[in-house]
C-alpha cells in the first residue's frame, strides 16, 4: 500500500510549517551584580582527607524485646478435653 493512497499518511508526510520562535538566554543570574565564584575542589578534598574530630558517645541498646513481667499461664489442656468429652456423651 503506498502512502499516496491513504490521505492521512499523505498529510503526515507533507509535514507542517513551524512558526519562528525567539529564545531567551536564561543562563545569567537573575539578581544583578552577583559574583559567581568557582568551586575550589582541592580545598574541599583537603578538608575531607584531614578528617573530623568525633566525640565519644554512649549508646543504649534497646533492640531486645521487653519481656519483664510477662508470664506464661498454665495450660489445663486435659481438663478442657475432659469437659468436651463429658458434654459430648450427654
Swiss-Prot record:
Region (Disordered): 57-90
Source species: Dictyostelium discoideum
Stretches that traverse the bilayer: none
GO cellular component labels: cytosol; extracellular matrix
InterPro entries hit by this protein: Actobindin, WH2_dom
Domain WH2: 4-21, 40-57
Keyword list, A-Z: Actin-binding, Repeat
Protein name: Actobindin-B/C
Molecular-function GO term, any one: actin binding
Complexes and interactors: Monomer.
Reported function: Is able to bind two actin monomers at high concentrations of G-actin. Inhibits actin polymerization by sequestering G-actin and stabilizing actin dimers.
Amino acid at each position: 500500500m503506498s502512502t499516496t493512497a491513504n490521505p492521512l499518511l499523505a498529510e503526515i508526510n507533507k509535514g507542517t510549517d513551524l512558526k519562528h520562535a525567539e529564545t531567551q538566554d536564561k543562563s545569567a543570574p537573575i539578581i544583578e551584580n552577583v559574583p559567581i565564584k568557582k568551586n575550589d575542589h582541592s580545598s574541599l578534598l583537603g578538608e575531607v582527607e584531614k578528617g573530623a574530630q568525633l566525640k565519644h558517645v554512649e549508646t543504649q541498646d534497646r533492640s531486645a524485646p521487653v519481656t519483664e513481667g510477662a508470664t506464661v499461664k498454665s495450660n489445663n489442656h486435659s481438663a478442657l478435653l475432659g469437659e468436651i468429652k463429658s458434654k459430648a456423651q450427654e
